[in-house]
């Protein structure tokens, strides 16, 4: 007799499937890196196109050939390091001791947070240096500049970013050098390297169990009665309650997701936007005006969504050779 085996439909790894708390993702884990630089960067998703890239994998049957490759375009205007935070280790995890803010902050930040009217930067730096002996980690506050892009908003996005260094003292010295300055994608990323992409996915609203969990559509009498797209049984008589693992209708999409080891194919400056802008601009975005990054494959979220690129926290052993791009499609994406 054939052994009957059917794994459950859908993964419970991401339960509860509810809306993300905020659109700008919060990153709790950063890789250990001794290089004195930021460990992450933010950009805005523009859209997708395709390119012909020479396959450099020696074990691939298409080695040395031009391969059709889908790519995602991210517009990455320079981000600004607006603050420094010192953390101490407590019995309940890391806790902020103190922080330093930069001078001459962008006036658009007042749309997002309350800025201090009177602030003594020198005293704040002296305070953070005074608690360095009990500091466990140093991180920086970074904000974006959406007003220079085609994203229709002026309010900056603020996120906390890890910084490289062997110890808190090295991290603090690097952070003080970067405080108040702009950081470009070319300063911290390289072509051919792998990064982690973190973003909030595209929202789908309230969906049924078939689309949300992928359960089988019932047949026969159930379909004729108009009940084909529902769960046949939501549990036994005892225990007299519904388990949380049972597939039910509800919110789908708009979740925080991380995609590991996405390859960067190209990092270009604002002078090279003609090589990527299609006829009529990208659908639901417009034209790229600043530095941009081409990432192999797809990324979470719709166009205009903030995507944070992080240094890989679980790097793979694949080659990080310089990609050779022979063609990038700039044909109109209207009606595609």
UniProtKB/Swiss-Prot annotation:
Listed name of the protein: Large ribosomal subunit protein uL3
Family: Belongs to the universal ribosomal protein uL3 family.
Assembly description: Part of the 50S ribosomal subunit. Forms a cluster with proteins L14 and L24e.
GO MF term list: rRNA binding; structural constituent of ribosome
Keywords: Ribonucleoprotein, Ribosomal protein, RNA-binding, rRNA-binding
Region span, Disordered: 1-34
Keyword check for Ribonucleoprotein: yes
Cellular component per GO, a single term: cytosolic large ribosomal subunit
Family matches, as InterPro entries: L3_arc_euk, Ribosomal_L3_dom_3_arc_sf, Ribosomal_uL3, Ribosomal_uL3_arc, Ribosomal_uL3_CS, Transl_B-barrel_sf
Origin organism lineage: Archaea, Methanobacteriati, Methanobacteriota, Methanomada group, Methanobacteria
Segments traversing the membrane: none
NCBIfam families: L3_arch, PRK04231.1
Role played: One of the primary rRNA binding proteins, it binds directly near the 3'-end of the 23S rRNA, where it nucleates assembly of the 50S subunit.
GO BP term (any one): translation
């Amino acid at each position: 007799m054939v052994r009957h085996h059917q794994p459950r439909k859908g993964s419970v790894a991401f339960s509860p499937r509810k809306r993300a708390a905020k659109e700008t993702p919060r990153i709790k884990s950063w890789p250990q890196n001794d290089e004195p630089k930021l460990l992450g960067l933010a950009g805005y998703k523009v859209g997708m196109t395709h390119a012909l890239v020479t396959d450099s994998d020696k074990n691939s049957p298409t080695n040395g050939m031009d391969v059709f490759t889908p790519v995602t375009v991210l517009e990455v205007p320079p981000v600004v390091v607006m603050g420094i935070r010192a953390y101490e280790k407590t019995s309940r995890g890391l806790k902020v001791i103190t922080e330093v803010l930069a001078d001459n902050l962008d006036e658009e930040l007042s749309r997002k947070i309350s800025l201090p009217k009177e602030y003594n930067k020198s005293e704040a730096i002296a305070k953070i240096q005074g608690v360095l002996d009990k500091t466990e980690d140093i991180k920086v506050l970074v904000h974006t500049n959406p007003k220079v892009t085609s994203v229709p908003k002026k309010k900056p996005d603020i996120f906390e970013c890890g910084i490289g260094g062997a110890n808190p003292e090295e991290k603090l010295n690097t952070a003080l050098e970067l405080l108040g300055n702009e950081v470009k994608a070319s300063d911290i990323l390289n072509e051919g390297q792998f990064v982690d992409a973190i973003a909030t996915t595209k929202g789908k609203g309230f969906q049924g169990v078939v689309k949300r969990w992928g359960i089988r559509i019932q047949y026969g009498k159930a379909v004729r009665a108009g009940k084909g797209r529902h769960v046949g049984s939501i549990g036994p008589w005892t225990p007299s309650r519904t388990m949380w693992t049972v597939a039910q209708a509800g919110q789908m999409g708009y979740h925080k997701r991380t995609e590991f080891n996405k390859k960067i194919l190209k990092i270009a400056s604002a002078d090279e936007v003609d090589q990527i802008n299609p006829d009529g601009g990208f659908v639901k975005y417009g034209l790229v005006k600043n530095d941009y990054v081409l990432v192999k494959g797809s990324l979470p979220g719709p166009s205009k969504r903030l995507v944070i690129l992080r240094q890989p926290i679980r790097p793979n052993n694949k080659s990080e050779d310089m990609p050779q791009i022979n063609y990038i499609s700039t044909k109109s994406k209207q009606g595609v």
